[in-house]
Amino acid sequence: KAVGYFSLGTFEFLVDSRSDGQEKFAFIEANARLQVEHTVTEEVTGVDLVQSQIEIASGKTLKDLGLTETPNARGFAIQARINMETIESDGTVRPSTGELTTYDPPSGPGVRTDGFGYAGFLPSTNYDSLLAKVIVYSARPSFEEASKKCERALSEFRIEGLATNIPFLRSVLKNNDFLTSNVTTRWVDENAA
């Protein structure tokens, strides 16, 4: 209300979970738009944020949408961004080009794929390398269970004709440090080789 903004937006925080059980939150940024990661919030709250944003823009209120109370989070969700790029053993990220000859995303209970790939697609390296987002939902609030489900979904994603970061993502999702949340913001840099 103080800034006169009446729509959906994104507030980002970094959480530092210390060994003594305390958590420290650091504010990163606020965006007057949805971020690409909004799908995780949709899965754990059951609220279609894009539809809600459109309805608010058309003049509806949160009361009209039945959203006067903060939705209860349920379960656990993870999103994996499938990029048309490879990650070298030294951590260098390289763009991938070529004609997409096969695009067969995973599906099933608790698996959602948002993407735009199709056989015959010729991507340009002049734009963002994002090809798809695989979002998995676990009804149980278990990070490890959701991680394993995400890894399984990525193992079923069939993409041919260009390289993606799926092998890297699968490696991260299977890593014990990752599964036990024993990571920091430097973890990928320190473990890429």
PLM features: residue spans?
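ATP-dependent carboxylate activation and anion-phosphoryl transfer catalytic cores
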Residues: 1-193
